């Protein structure tokens, strides 16, 4: 398809302005990670050459995504309550899946530059997968740490997804993806270490406690505390960078924070005041709703950033959450069946997320005159 006909189709999510702007997009990034630059980069440069030049970069991204999906569902099968005894191999398997994902995530961009196939779609596909992967890896990581299905594990997962959103918001505002000194690579190795610790020392290791004068805390809760506080520090750095180097107004950035902040607030309220103890009755449907919604809103921000467009503060898919709040707050759960609603809403959210991914990918491949999972023969363009 010729790019002159890029507006000869309809898209729910990609505006005509976005179609024009993505043709101008250029990635700008900064990685200050010692491990990435001085250690892993040598391995990744070697590994990417194992792929044939006919191999599409997005296919590498997809392989990494699939490895995390498999890890999540295998863990869910053996540890549906995110704790308890599981086969020892599972912990090594989860660590291996993160390593595979890390390698694929590092090599997809290298492959794109190697075969001259870099595009805004590639970055969107990469970071869009990362948004969903954040939910999945945090769930499996906390399962190895024996945290269990509860408000603590749920909040920690969504908090890290919020941190990921803030990193994207910083790039949206400044135009630069700053991975920092402690970035994704270090986080991934930390999670691998958690899985490996459980393999060697067993599940009970995480229930040991450490005392700080009169304060006592379990090892697994200490890890989560470090994770949460690290997220706070990261968000503060993001905010400082936005205020200092941002090209967008403060009001625009606040508006961009509205949907994700509402999601975080509603998730905490619903989980705490559910009339049916949702963490016991439909935990993975409930948590999955917010995992997917966080990934969806983040994906829309990434799309807006790459296409130099705007993120709407009103997300229609979130409107049913008003009914949940009313059902709990005003009607004490008697307005409708909360469990049934949770399950139905989960599938609605999932379908909307899949539709978003399909619509955006198919639209941008037409605009950019490329394929998503194969490389177009340049003689055909």
Curated annotation (Swiss-Prot):
It comes from the Eukaryota. Keywords: Membrane, Transferase, Transmembrane, Transmembrane helix. The chain crosses the membrane at residues 59-79, 84-104, 147-167, 190-210, 222-242, 250-270, 284-304, 311-331, 344-364. One of its GO terms (molecular function) is phosphotransferase activity, for other substituted phosphate groups. It is a multi-pass membrane protein. Gene3D superfamilies: 1.20.120.1760. PROSITE patterns: CDP_ALCOHOL_P_TRANSF. Its main location: membrane. One of its GO terms (cellular component) is membrane. GO terms for biological process: phospholipid biosynthetic process. It is found in: Membrane. Belongs to the CDP-alcohol phosphatidyltransferase class-I family. This is Uncharacterized CDP-alcohol phosphatidyltransferase class-I family protein 1.
């Amino acid at each position: 398809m010729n790019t002159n006909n890029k507006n000869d189709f309809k898209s729910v999510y990609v505006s005509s302005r976005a179609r024009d702007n993505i043709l101008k997009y250029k990635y700008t990034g900064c990685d200050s990670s010692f491990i990435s630059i001085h250690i892993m980069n040598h391995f990744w440069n070697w590994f990417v050459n194992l792929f044939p030049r006919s191999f599409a970069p997005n296919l590498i991204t997809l392989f990494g995504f699939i490895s995390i999906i498999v890890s999540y569902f295998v863990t869910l099968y053996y540890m549906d309550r995110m704790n308890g005894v599981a086969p020892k191999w599972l912990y090594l398997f989860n660590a291996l899946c993160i390593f595979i994902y890390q390698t694929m995530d590092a090599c997809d961009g290298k492959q794109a530059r190697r075969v001259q196939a870099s595009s805004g779609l590639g970055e969107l596909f990469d970071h869009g997968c990362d948004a969903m992967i954040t939910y999945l890896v945090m769930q499996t990581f906390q399962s190895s740490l024996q945290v269990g299905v509860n408000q603590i594990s749920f909040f920690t997962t969504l908090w890290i997804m919020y941190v990921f959103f803030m990193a994207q918001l910083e790039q949206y505002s400044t135009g630069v993806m700053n991975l920092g000194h402690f970035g994704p690579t270090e986080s991934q190795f930390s999670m691998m270490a958690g899985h490996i610790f459980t393999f060697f020392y067993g599940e009970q290791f995480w229930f040991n406690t450490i005392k700080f004068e009169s304060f006592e805390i379990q090892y697994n809760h200490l890890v989560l505390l470090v994770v949460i506080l690290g997220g706070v520090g990261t968000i503060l750095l993001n905010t400082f960078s936005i205020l200092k180097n941002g090209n967008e107004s403060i009001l625009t950035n606040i508006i961009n924070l509205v949907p994700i902040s509402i999601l975080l607030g509603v998730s905490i309220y619903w989980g705490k005041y559910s009339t049916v103890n949702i963490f016991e009755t439909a935990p993975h449907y409930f948590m999955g709703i917010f995992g997917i919604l966080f990934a969806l809103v983040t994906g829309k921000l990434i799309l807006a950033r790459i296409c130099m467009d705007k993120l709407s503060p009103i997300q229609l898919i979130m409107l049913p959450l008003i009914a949940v709040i009313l059902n709990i707050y005003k009607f004490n759960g008697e307005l409708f069946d909360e469990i049934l609603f949770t399950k139905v809403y989960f599938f609605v959210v999932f379908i909307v997320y899949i539709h978003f991914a399909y619509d955006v990918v198919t639209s941008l491949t037409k605009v950019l005159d490329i394929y998503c999972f194969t490389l177009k023969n340049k003689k055909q363009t």
